[in-house]
């Protein structure tokens, strides 16, 4: 390609498919760009998750913090009535055993997910709206003494990450077909949808984990206008770059 690496700059909206990491998506894009072009992303999507991955190219990488700080919208499916070690579908289901946590201080006694009504699930979901303290999943990229928490857990360590302040602007229960709850969540930086699934299940006394996750919006960028990763070419990549504003 003829364009010098120094001239390419902007934001690129990608619709990440399930089954690949955000880092792998970045590598695919880098192969289409001039050698030496900087490429980063503004917010990791787990391998099982799909949707909007905002890539920052060239000088736009300087705006990473600003883009990561923008509001994000997710569509998610939560399965109530069971848990997994990773709070998502990437580990085996286990029966839920109630335990004393901040999320269970006012929880109902253990029960079956099938017994829950739409209104009960919705009321539980609404308790996570606002500025809340959220305990990140142990299987996360957050570092503990320089090592990713997930790597420490896989090595056999017991990790209990401290709750952190996050903001959930809105949460909507779209459908409840026991044991699956379909939700839409609008949130700020650092919010773990997996943790909301986990804590909602604990609050309702049945356990819960995330089965599907799709990011649909970051700031003003929407997944409906994003390029599919398998349809990327050098030409459509360049014409699809959006300017990065400070």
Regions found by a protein language model. Give the residues of each.
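Catalytic/RNA-binding core of pseudouridine synthases
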Residues: 1-246
């Amino acid at each position: 390609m003829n364009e010098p690496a120094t001239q390419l700059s902007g934001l690129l909206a990608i619709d990440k498919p399930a089954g690949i990491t955000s880092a792998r998506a970045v590598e695919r894009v880098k192969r289409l760009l001039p050698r030496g072009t900087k490429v980063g992303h503004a917010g990791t999507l787990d391998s099982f998750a799909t949707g909007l991955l905002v890539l920052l190219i060239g000088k736009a990488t300087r705006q990473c913090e600003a883009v990561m700080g923008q509001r994000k919208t997710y569509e998610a499916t939560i399965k109530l009535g069971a848990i997994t070690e990773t709070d998502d579908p990437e580990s085996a289901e286990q029966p839920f055993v109630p335990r004393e946590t901040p999320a269970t201080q006012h929880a109902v006694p253990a029960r079956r997910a099938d017994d829950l009504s739409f209104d009960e699930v919705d009321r539980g979901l609404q308790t996570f709206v606002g500025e809340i303290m959220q305990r990140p999943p142990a299987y996360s990229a957050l570092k503990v003494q320089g090592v990713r928490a997930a790597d420490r857990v896989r090595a056999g360590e017991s990790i209990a990450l401290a709750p952190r302040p996050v903001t959930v602007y809105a949460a909507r229960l779209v459908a409840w077909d026991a044991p699956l709850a379909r939700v839409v969540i609008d949130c700020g930086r650092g919010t773990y949808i997996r943790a909301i699934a986990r804590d909602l299940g604990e609050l309702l006394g049945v356990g819960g984990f995330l089965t599907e996750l799709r990011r649909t919006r970051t700031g003003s960028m929407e997944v409906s206008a994003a390029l599919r990763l398998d349809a990327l070419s050098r030409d459509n990549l360049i014409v699809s770059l959006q300017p990065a504003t400070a």
